[in-house]
């Protein structure tokens, strides 16, 4: 890492070097692990693309280079929300470089951020949920599905849980946010706790600081990749689309609102800083009410 610092000081300014410095800055500022991983997922492919296209130095990156990259992403038929998020992350990267005086001006200043479709990706239907639960092969798999549906937890939050984070008597689950950040409380109901106990009987009750979810092949803590692969394979097997951790989170949000939960209570449970996204779910749940009125309204059914 000192080598990176030395090269930056000597104005070498290779794209790969400044990327490492950017990630180091985020780590030193104690960004949450999920946020840090998002930066890596969205910026590193751009850095690698630059390297494979002989764009080695910062001075080689022009607005045209960035537009070419974003256009190629569109040609791959990536979701508009995904491309929008990538562009925002790249913009943050270049803004940081300007702040650090490694660039005089960000090449992103002249690049329009691709618009994201406002539609929300679909949640699971009741039929999807039934199929998911009927086709799990192990106690762990069923426990994971119920836990995600019941808590609205993010994938990283689920995977970081230890035995001491879950109160099996009350259903209170503490989501640890790391130093400098406030922990969050979510809840799981009786059915989820009963299934979790069945999983514990199989794996052994985890100790206070021991990770709850283990790989079934290695016995080591389950990783984000392992979780995603398990859900993807299950979705393909039973023909349920978008079977990812975040679809469970969307399902939790939409069904909580459908069942009458306050949007502000939901905001706290999901750990959102604002309710902008949740308002879109609220609109969907209100559409449900309108459809129900069309079907069951007193006057129109006279």
Protein language model regions, located:
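Conserved catalytic core of the tyrosine transesterase superfamily
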Residues: 1-302
